[in-house]
Amino acid sequence: MAKVNIKPLEDKILVQANEAETTTASGLVIPDTAKEKPQEGTVVAVGPGRWDDDGAKRIPLDVSEGDTVIYSKYGGTEIKYNGEEYLILSARDVLAVVSK
């Protein structure tokens, strides 16, 4: 995973989606049109967190760079940067962090 010059703002997270499987367990090849949208990816960059209701301090995020996360199927904004595809998610779109 290469370093990216994108810094998310507030409670946003930059994720590179893990590739969806291209073959089934029985060996059938899945065409691109039939693939499920991936819901798992690696966190590439993390914003500083959002401000609390008083605006006095930032609330840090529960994820950090390098974490593998599971996120909402239709959450986030897809972007392309330097030929790579990324997803910018809000922290509330992240459903879980995968333990290693």
Swiss-Prot record:
GO terms for molecular function: ATP binding; metal ion binding; protein folding chaperone; protein-folding chaperone binding; unfolded protein binding. The keyword Ion transport does not apply. Pfam families: Cpn10. One of its GO terms (biological process) is chaperone cofactor-dependent protein refolding. Keywords: Chaperone, Cytoplasm, Stress response. SMART domains: Cpn10. CDD domains: cpn10 (cd00320). Heptamer of 7 subunits arranged in a ring. Interacts with the chaperonin GroEL. Belongs to the GroES chaperonin family. This is Co-chaperonin GroES.
